[in-house]
């Protein structure tokens, strides 16, 4: 073999070695690139999971805020209803003596006297108008004559034996009671049969 042939053979061997080294380098590079991609995928998956958890947390926070808003709105509406419903309580309580006095005037007036008769009719009309006006605002009269005694609506002044009335029934109403929107403003003062 000549030098030239040796050289050609050596060059071919060197080329094969270079190609082999290049292929090994490609394999190593591909493996490291694959490892890098897997690490990147794992990192992205972790970021995705964290983002999903954060979104779920934000959705939960929004739902809680909406529920709290609804609760606040409902409580405010209830408070307004209560205020509207019972705003007249003190005012109505102050009107009760006026009603009592008009009723006393009718009871004590001389119905036989012609001059007083016209006055009593005027007082009676005034009382009726007054009662119908306050009833529009939820004030109702408790007049339990002949009814069974109810401690929630009646205040017993005393008990008295009576053959004309059943036991535990109201036989005399000393002072009428009043409720405002189903809440007792003043119980009726009564005498109860034994």
Curated annotation (Swiss-Prot):
Main location per the UniProt record: cytoplasm
CDD domains with a match to the protein in the record: GrpE
GO CC term (a single one): cytosol
Biological process according to GO: protein folding
An MF annotation (GO) of this entry: protein homodimerization activity
Described function: Participates actively in the response to hyperosmotic and heat shock by preventing the aggregation of stress-denatured proteins, in association with DnaK and GrpE. It is the nucleotide exchange factor for DnaK and may function as a thermosensor. Unfolded proteins bind initially to DnaJ; upon interaction with the DnaJ-bound protein, DnaK hydrolyzes its bound ATP, resulting in the formation of a stable complex. GrpE releases ADP from DnaK; ATP binding to DnaK triggers the release of the substrate protein, thus completing the reaction cycle.
Name of the protein in question: Protein GrpE
Organism field: Aliivibrio fischeri (strain ATCC 700601 / ES114)
Lineage of producing organism: Bacteria, Pseudomonadati, Pseudomonadota, Gammaproteobacteria, Vibrionales
């Amino acid at each position: 073999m000549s030098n030239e042939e040796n050289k050609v053979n050596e060059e071919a061997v060197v080329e094969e070695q270079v190609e082999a080294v290049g292929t090994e380098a490609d394999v190593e590079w591909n493996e490291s690139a694959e490892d890098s991609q897997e690490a990147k995928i794992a990192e992205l998956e972790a970021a995705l999971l964290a983002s999903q958890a954060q979104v779920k947390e934000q959705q939960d926070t929004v739902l809680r805020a909406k529920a709290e808003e609804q609760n606040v709105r409902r409580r405010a509406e209830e408070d307004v209803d209560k205020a509207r419903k019972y705003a007249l309580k003190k005012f109505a309580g102050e009107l009760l003596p006026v009603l009592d006095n008009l009723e006393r005037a009718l009871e004590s007036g001389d119905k036989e006297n012609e001059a007083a008769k016209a006055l009593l009719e005027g007082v009676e009309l005034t009382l009726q108008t007054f009662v119908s006006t306050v009833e529009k605002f939820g004030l109702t009269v408790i007049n339990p004559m002949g009814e069974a005694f109810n401690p929630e609506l009646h205040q017993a002044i005393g008990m008295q034996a009576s053959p004309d009335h059943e036991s535990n029934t109201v036989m005399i109403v000393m002072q009428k009671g009043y409720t405002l929107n189903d809440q007792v403003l003043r119980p009726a003062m009564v005498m109860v049969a034994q």
